[in-house]
């Protein structure tokens, strides 16, 4: 025994081809007889088979034409075997005692259980194969007789694919029942046909059975239409259609879910779709006719057909069933099938046969069965009539579409052609320029390696260069600071000495003002005084030898003489630093520290591959690259010294002077042209800034003149970088200004003595006063040397407000009125730049000189008053001094004060004095 799958779908078999033919031949019996070939021997519940799957007919031999259960009316003239005409289906219900499976179960719901689990018994055939062959031969003879009828029903047969012998393919011969897994649509169509069949023996077959098998898209012929009309007329005459729902007890529901509602509920019974067991196939009929009950049908299939034929039949069945699929989400207990209406134009409408598909179990379907009518609805989706204009419009649209497509393709073609031309040109250009790529790559790789090695070398040597540069700057700074400190000490010593004499203050013999021991301090002061006097004597002797003794004034010379010890120490340290600088690159190849070698490498790059040279911004990198090497050469360069070498005459300057200068025309944006100016900006200006802060002495006229000279040279020679907008230039000028202010605050000192002390011109206080006065005038001249570099406002603030009005005018107040004062005033006015007074408008001078002009007017009045009552010679000298004062006032453009002095003292040569200024 074999256990089959739980899910069993039992359906009624479609009419076979032979049954259709026999049905057409047996149209003559009385109307009350069942139509031939309709399969009415099987009731709605599948009456020809018991639930166990066995035949209802008892065993025993009977003629094939009358007693074979599978052939029925097809071979026996439309009556079942052993039945009289008019008996209907009663013989089919007789052999219920032969069922063996129901006796095996005593349960009340054995029918439902047996539907889910069927048991088959395989019995061997007791007849010979000759009987089978004989039956086949007789079957073929019957097939030839009904050939004409088969052609009429060809459209109906297209719904059921048959094999070459006319047998309906049995898809589940081994199970004994039909499990329609791949043919759900066929099952639903058969169930719908089953609905139209009558349940009594006198019911007429549904006339639409042949119409339902019409394949969608197939045009019916005249014979098909005639047969349909004839069957429809017979259905009207009989009028004994009985709905299947009237006998729910004969039906059997196949439930796919064990949780469905109970069979006892009438509502559930009404909602179920009734399936009938598929009728036996021709092979099964033959097998039953020869007495092989429950035999395995696969043996016959294996003997008759091969596997290929079976697959072909499967394909034909799937092709024939061209019906939309059933909705998958229907409830299990309802199992309603709604057939979708075809959206295309029905072909039957052209023959005047309206039709429509209706759902099974609907009210419309029931009314059709009751009234024995076949109502068909006219489809709403009629086809639009085809006109010439419509065809022309479609053709025109098609033509426009093709033209547009052609235009697009043509544009694409032209685009591809142009792309091809461009690609060809690019290939030619690249092939022509690829000759030197290898050499270029090799050269650039060499330059890359060279630059990396150079940077690694500089990263190691630059800290050493910075240390040496700091050492040399510190050395010069110490020397300058030492000289400034010595000058300040000398001024303090003389001031304290002469102040005590003038005030005649009594001081403690051994304590200073801070309570310290004065013995040690006085000892150092005596040693400084001795050294100071010795230096003055040596300078005086030097002036006598040069013949400048007559023009010299005390205080105009700079006391920058050093002792031999200081000079020796300074030179030793300087030499040591110079030797250390020479050892910086002693372990390096010349190509990595020589400016000429480095320059030649980049010049080769520039001349061969200028584009890549420019793209790499080498012109902007060279000043920074040469910076350490140039600073090393400028290590001992100090423009304050007399023997200092001009930087433009040094080797690095001459080597880089013509860098980038080639025969070809220079580009406007070529940065190599500005190589030297950039080096001056990055190297020279920072060097000068350090010198101005730490080494320059504004009291020294020589140093000031050299600083002014180098600054003017940079301004005039490199105007693109040395200007007021340049950052490094601003830093340099700021350093100069701060140094001048510091000198003005720390080094200028003007003593104040009573006139009776200054009467003795050989006394110490008088000489010290004169020396400080002339040193202040000298500083005034040094400040005013920066005219043209600093602004007029800055210079006037420093020289006039900070020095003249603050210190020098104070000295004029304590000086003797006479020739000496006029001489001092003349020297002060000579320090002023002439450009200050050339563009003045009106009769007034600059506002800062107003106090100085008032002093000159007061000096003229004093000279005139002192000459009253004196001799004519003294009066004549006084008058000459007044004229000189008028001339001095006119030289500083103080015309209002000059006219006032001239009118007060009857100076008639005023105009000539002004013009002679």
Curated annotation (Swiss-Prot):
Listed Basic and acidic residues bias regions: 161-172, 234-256, 542-554
Gene Ontology CC annotation, any one: cytosol
Superkingdom of source: Eukaryota
Gene Ontology molecular-function annotations: DNA binding; histone methyltransferase binding
Cross-link (Glycyl lysine isopeptide (Lys-Gly) (interchain with G-Cter in SUMO2)), chain numbering: 149
Keyword Signal: no
Family: Belongs to the GCF family.
Subunit structure comment from the entry: Interacts with PAX3 and PAX7. Interacts with WDR5; associates with a histone methyltransferase (HMT) complex composed at least of RBBP5, ASH2L, SET1, SET2 and KMT2A/MLL1, KMT2D/MLL2, KMT2C/MLL3 and KMT2B/MLL4 through direct interaction with WDR5.
UniProt-recorded name of the protein: PAX3- and PAX7-binding protein 1
Gene name of this polypeptide: PAXBP1
């Amino acid at each position: 025994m074999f256990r089959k799958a739980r899910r069993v779908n039992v359906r009624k078999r479609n009419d076979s081809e032979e049954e259709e033919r026999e049905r057409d031949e047996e149209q003559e019996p009385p109307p009350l007889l069942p139509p031939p070939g309709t399969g009415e021997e099987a009731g709605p519940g599948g009456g020809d088979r018991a639930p166990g799957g066995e035949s209802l007919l008892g065993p025993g031999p009977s003629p094939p034409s009358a007693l074979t259960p599978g052939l029925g009316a097809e071979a026996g003239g439309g009556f079942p075997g052993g039945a009289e005409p008019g008996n209907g289906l009663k013989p089919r219900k007789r052999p219920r005692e032969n069922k063996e499976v129901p006796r095996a179960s005593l349960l009340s719901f054995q029918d439902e259980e047996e539907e889910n689990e069927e048991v088959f018994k395989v019995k061997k055939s007791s007849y010979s194969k000759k009987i089978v062959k004989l039956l086949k031969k007789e079957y073929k003879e019957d097939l030839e007789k009904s050939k004409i009828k088969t052609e009429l029903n060809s459209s109906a047969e297209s719904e059921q694919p048959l094999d070459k012998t006319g047998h309906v393919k049995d898809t589940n011969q081994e199970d004994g029942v039909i499990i329609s897994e791949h043919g759900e649509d066929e099952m639903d169509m058969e169930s719908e046909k089953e609905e139209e069949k009558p349940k009594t023996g006198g019911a007429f077959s549904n006339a639409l059975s042949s119409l339902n098998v019409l394949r969608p898209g197939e045009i019916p012929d005249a014979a098909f239409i005639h047969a349909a009309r004839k069957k429809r007329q017979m259905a009207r005459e009989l009028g004994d259609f009985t709905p299947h729902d009237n006998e729910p007890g004969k039906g059997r529901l196949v439930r796919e879910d064990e949780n469905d509602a109970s069979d006892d509920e009438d509502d559930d019974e009404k909602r179920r779709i009734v399936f009938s067991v598929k009728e036996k196939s021709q092979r099964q009929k033959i097998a039953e006719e020869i007495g092989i009950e429950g035999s395995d049908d696969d043996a016959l299939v294996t003997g008759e057909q091969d596997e290929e034929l079976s697959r072909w039949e499967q394909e034909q069945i799937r092709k024939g069933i061209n019906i939309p699929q059933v909705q998958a989400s229907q409830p299990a207990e309802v199992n309603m099938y709604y057939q979708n209406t075809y959206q295309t134009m029905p072909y039957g409408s052209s023959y005047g046969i309206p039709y429509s598909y209706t759902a099974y179990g609907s009210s419309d379907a029931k009314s059709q069965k009751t009234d024995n009518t076949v109502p068909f609805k006219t489809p709403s989706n009629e086809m639009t009539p085809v006109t010439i204009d419509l065809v022309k419009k479609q053709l025109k649209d098609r033509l426009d579409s093709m033209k547009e497509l052609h235009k697009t393709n043509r544009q694409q073609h032209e685009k591809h052609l142009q792309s091809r031309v461009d690609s060809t040109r690019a290939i030619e250009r690249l092939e022509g320029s690829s000759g030197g790529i290898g050499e270029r790559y090799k050269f650039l790789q060499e330059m890359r390696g060279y630059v990396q090695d150079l940077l690694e070398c500089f990263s190691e040597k630059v800290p050493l260069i910075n240390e040496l540069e700091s050492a040399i700057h510190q050395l010069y700074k110490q020397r300058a600071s030492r000289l400034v400190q010595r000058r300040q000490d000398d001024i303090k010593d003389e001031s304290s000495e002469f102040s005590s004499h003038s005030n005649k203050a009594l001081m403690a013999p051994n304590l200073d003002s801070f309570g310290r021991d004065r013995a040690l301090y006085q000892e150092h002061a005596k040693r400084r005084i001795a050294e100071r006097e010795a230096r003055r004597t040596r300078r005086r002797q030097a002036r006598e030898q040069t013949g400048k003794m007559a023009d010299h004034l005390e205080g105009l010379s700079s006391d920058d003489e050093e002792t031999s010890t200081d000079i020796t120490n300074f030179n030793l340290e300087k030499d040591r630093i110079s030797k250390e600088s020479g050892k910086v690159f002693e372990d390096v190849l010349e190509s990595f520290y020589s400016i000429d070698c480095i320059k030649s490498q980049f010049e080769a790059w520039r001349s061969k591959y200028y584009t890549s040279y420019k793209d790499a911004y080498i012109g902007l990198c060279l000043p920074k690259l040469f910076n350490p090497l140039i600073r090393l050469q400028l290590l001992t360069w100090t423009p304050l010294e007399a023997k200092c070498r001009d930087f433009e005459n040094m080797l690095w300057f001459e080597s880089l002077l013509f860098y980038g200068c080639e025969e070809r025309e220079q580009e406007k944006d070529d940065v190599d042209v500005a190589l030297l100016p950039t080096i001056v900006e990055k190297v020279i200006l920072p060097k000068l800034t350090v010198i101005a802060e730490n080494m320059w002495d504004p009291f020294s006229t020589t140093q000031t003149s050299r600083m002014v000279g180098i600054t003017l040279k940079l301004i005039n020679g490199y105007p693109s970088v040395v200007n007021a907008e340049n950052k490094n230039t601003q830093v340099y000028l700021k350093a100069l200004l701060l140094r001048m202010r510091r000198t003005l605050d720390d080094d200028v000192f003007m003593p104040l003595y009573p006139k009776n002390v200054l009467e003795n011109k050989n006394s110490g206080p008088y000489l010290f006063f004169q020396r400080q006065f002339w040193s202040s005038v000298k500083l005034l001249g040094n400040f005013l040397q920066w005219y043209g570099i600093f602004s007029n406002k800055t210079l006037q603030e420093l020289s006039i407000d900070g020095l003249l009005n603050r210190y020098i005018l104070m000295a004029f107040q304590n000086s003797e009125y006479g020739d000496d004062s006029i001489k001092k005033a003349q020297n002060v006015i000579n320090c002023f730049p002439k450009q200050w007074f050339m563009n003045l408008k009106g009769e007034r001078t600059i506002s800062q000189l107003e106090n100085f002009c008032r002093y000159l007017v007061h000096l003229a009045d004093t000279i005139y008053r002192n000459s009253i009552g004196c001799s004519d010679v003294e009066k004549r000298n006084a008058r000459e001094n007044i004229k000189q004062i008028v001339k001095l006032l006119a030289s500083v453009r103080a015309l209002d004060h000059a006219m006032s002095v001239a009118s007060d003292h009857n100076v008639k040569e005023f105009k000539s004095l002004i013009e002679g200024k």
